[in-house]
UniProtKB/Swiss-Prot annotation:
Region (G5): 194-196
UniProt domain tr-type G: residue ranges: 5-227
Protein name listed in UniProt: Elongation factor 1-alpha 1
Lineage, top ranks: Eukaryota, Sar, Alveolata, Ciliophora, Intramacronucleata
Binding-site residues for GTP, renumbered to this chain: 14-21, 91-95, 153-156
Gene name linked to the record: EFA1
Molecular function GO labels: GTP binding; GTPase activity; translation elongation factor activity
Family, similarity comment: Belongs to the TRAFAC class translation factor GTPase superfamily. Classic translation factor GTPase family. EF-Tu/EF-1A subfamily.
Length: 442
């Protein structure tokens, strides 16, 4: 047994037809946890449907369908490994809810693969003002995904095929817009690939002798492994709460920061009720403790299913326990709201697992969305493309944190008209004054 491989969570972004599914499917197909039998089955099914060319994308479509049907999808199917690393693809944006998922994320992405279609006309469509490519890159950057590799896909369909001139042209343009978003393109790898043919995915392509850089896999392996927030106090947003016969109340969720241990007295915010954690379970096995990234169920004594619910946050009562939030100030980027956002606007906010209406109490500043520099104080409104500092107050009890202290609880999506209209990063919080047992305000 050698040293255990390091693990990275990847998010795959890019325009809708850039070939994300094919490229991602190819990685999983070549390096993943899918056995040959399953792949043969997929190939046969896609051939029967007359979609033989989609065999890699088909891998992903099948996984998506299963993922949408139930939560018990075998997560191995979304994993692949290289010689040095394990990777999990935490989201591939085929979903309408991709933006929401990326923010409230089932998991924080450590790095991104930005897939660009290099075919004639395709690149221009993806990068145009309305293109999703820009939005996704800005989103990834705002949400703290600072490492990225650019995969220039469909090099087999440039004119002429595998054109170095086309590669250079696109690289220049993508670099310009990534630099505006905040990335440092000079430090990034731009890998020319064909997700379908397999050029430069694992092995250097003989079709592009002019390219001297790393393959896609080698570029992924050059990402730095982030430090997991294990030393921070515990924060565990609840996804569900179950009542299990003979055991009792079992909250379920993912440890975002710190460590959950049996025997710990847990405080649930925003309500403020506490109970002892009797046992911790992962994958149906009891474990002494759970670390960041672990999905767990834990048994609490003395609380009923009525006391706690999805969106509550579990924390250690003795180490910076989580509390109810009176109001918070956030750096907010308005993405695709059709009108003007003014003070008084009350959309639903998705922050970690909480889903609560919050009122935009005050528009404090308007800022340049890329540099964050203030351009106006107390603006009358913000519209799509604007950014600014906004003070919000929740309509019901809510527990959030600042992005700087507990990142996963400090970023949110603003949902309205069945879409994500804005995203925010929380900069400061005003906590509700709590009363202690004797009724005195703390």
């Amino acid at each position: 047994m050698g040293k255990e491989k390091e693990h990275l969570n990847l998010v795959v972004i890019g325009h809708v037809d850039s070939g994300k599914s094919t490229t991602t499917g190819h990685l999983i197909y070549k390096l993943g946890g899918i056995d040959a039998r399953t792949i043969e089955k997929f190939e046969k099914e896609s051939a029967e449907m007359g979609k033989a060319s989609f065999k890699y994308a088909w891998v992903l479509d099948k996984l998506k369908a299963e993922r949408e049907r139930g939560i018990t999808i075998d997560i191995a199917l979304w994993k692949f490994e290289t010689e040095n690393r394990h990777y999990t693809i935490i989201d591939a944006p085929g979903h309408r809810d991709f933006i929401k998922n990326m923010i409230t994320g089932t998991s924080q992405a450590d790095a991104a693969i930005l897939i660009i279609a290099s075919g004639t006309g395709e690149f221009e469509a993806g990068i145009s003002k309305e293109g999703q490519t820009r939005e996704h890159a800005l989103l990834a950057y705002t949400m703290g995904v600072k490492q990225m590799v650019v995969a220039m896909n469909k090099m087999d369909s440039t004119e002429p095929p595998y054109s170095e001139d086309r590669y250079e042209e696109i690289k220049k343009e993508v670099s310009t817009f990534l630099a505006k978003v905040g990335y440092k393109p000079a430090k990034m790898n731009f890998v020319p690939i064909s997700g379908f043919q397999g050029d430069n995915i694992q092995e250097n392509s003989t079709n592009m002798p002019w390219y001297k850089g790393p393959t896609l896999c080698a570029a992924l392996d050059s990402f730095k492994i982030p430090k997991r927030p294990i030393a921070k106090p515990l924060r565990l947003p609840l996804q569900d709460v179950y009542k299990i016969g003979g055991i009792g109340t079992v909250p379920v969720g993912r440890v975002e920061t710190g460590v959950l241990k049996a025997g710990m007295v847990i405080t649930f915010a925003p309500k403020g009720c506490s109970a002892e954690c009797k046992s911790v379970e992962m994958h149906h096995e009891e474990v002494p403790e759970a670390a960041p990234g672990n999905n767990v169920g834990f048994n609490v004594k003395g609380l009923s299913v009525k006391d706690i619910k999805r969106g509550f946050v579990a924390s250690d009562s003795k180490n910076d326990p989580a509390t109810d939030t009176e109001s918070f100030v956030s750096h907010t980027i308005v993405m695709n709201h059709p009108g003007e956002i003014k003070a008084g606007y009350t959309p639903v906010i998705d922050c970690h697992t909480a889903h609560i209406a919050c009122k935009f109490e005050e528009l404090l500043t308007k800022a340049d969305k890329r540099s964050g520099k203030m351009t106006e104080e107390n603006p009358k409104f913000l519209k799509a493309g604007d950014a600014g500092l906004i003070r919000l107050s929740p309509s019901k009890p809510l527990c959030v944190e600042t992005f700087a202290t507990y990142a996963p609880l400090g970023r949110f999506a603003v949902r309205d008209m069945r879409q994500t209209v804005a995203v925010g990063v929380i900069q400061e919080i005003k906590k509700k004054a709590t009363e202690d047992k004797k009724g005195k305000k703390k």
